[in-house]
Design a protein with these regions (language model features):
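Active-site neighborhood of HAD-like aspartate-dependent phosphohydrolases
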Residues: 1-41
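Asp-based, Mg2+/Mn2+-dependent phosphohydrolase catalytic module
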Residues: 1-3, 95-98, 111-217
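Short beta->alpha linker loops
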Residues: 19, 43-47, 72, 85-89, ...
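Residue-level detector of anion-binding/catalytic polar loops
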Residues: 34, 103, 180
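Metal-dependent phosphoesterase signature
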Residues: 34, 54-95, 100
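Conserved SAM-binding loop
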Residues: 13, 86, 104-107, 139, ...
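Hydrophobic alpha-helical core bundles mediating ligand binding, dimerization, or RNAP-core interactions
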Residues: 20-24, 28, 48-55, 69-80, ...
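Alpha-helical substrate-recognition element adjacent to the catalytic core
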Residues: 27-60, 65
Length: 217
């Protein structure tokens, strides 16, 4: 039986990944750079520092990585001033876990102000025993550090804790930490690599709830 559940946020709880995707092109254009194929996907699920590493990999060590990332975040923050929709099944899954007294945490690479803003807007903060941002951790996803810290705060063992993720880097992090890693794809479809390392794939959070109800997870 699962003893705890850790939620990623962007693209898993809220429909924010499309906003991040849209913001990459103008952020890069400000510095005279095109948006290369695969860049948004490679940076998905990482912190500011992780996104800088990805930019240097795509454009070279001399690219103004931090300037681009700061512009990316500025544009995204502007967009986040409007309500961002919840992903299908979020309310139902949270209610089921709460009813069954399974502790929950949010572990997101986004800054804490962004995480708290989304949770407060939808009135969901009370569900979570811990809310963790990766902005102050040394290692970003795909390292498992943020999930290990979340499990520690929940008081659960990784092998009995579910990680819900939509990004490749997040699935890699969950698998690396020894978690029950469930991929709920948003913009990134499951690949052969993901299928090798995740526990299972669900089409939505509604399916996650169904599998829990049926004892499949």
């Amino acid at each position: 039986m699962i003893q705890g559940v850790i939620f990623d946020m962007d693209g898993l709880m809220f429909d924010t990944e499309r906003i991040w995707n849209i913001c990459w092109e103008p952020a890069l254009a400000k510095f005279g750079l095109p948006c290369k194929d695969g860049l948004p996907q490679a940076a998905r699920g990482t912190t500011k520092a992780g996104s800088c590493d990805v930019l240097r990999r795509f454009y070279g060590e001399d690219c103004p990585a931090m300037g681009i990332v700061e512009e990316l975040y500025r544009l995204a923050y502007e967009a986040f001033n409007k309500p961002v929709p919840k992903m299908p099944g979020l309310d139902e899954l949270l209610a089921w876990l709460d009813e069954h007294h399974i502790p929950m945490a949010v572990a997101s690479s986004s800054p804490m102000t962004v995480i708290e803003g989304h949770l407060e807007h939808w009135g969901l903060g009370h569900y979570f025993k811990a809310v963790i941002s990766g902005e102050h951790l040394t290692r970003s996803k795909p390292a498992p550090d943020i999930f290990l810290l979340a499990a520690q705060k929940l008081g659960t063992e990784p092998a009995k804790t579910m990680v819900l993720e939509d990004s490749y880097n997040g699935v890699r992090a969950g698998a690396a930490g020894g978690f029950v890693t469930v991929m709920v794809p948003d913009l990134s479809p499951a690949t052969d690599e993901m299928r090798r390392i995740y526990t299972c794939e669900c089409a939505s959070l509604l399916e996650v709830r169904r599998k829990l109800e049926d004892g499949e997870l």
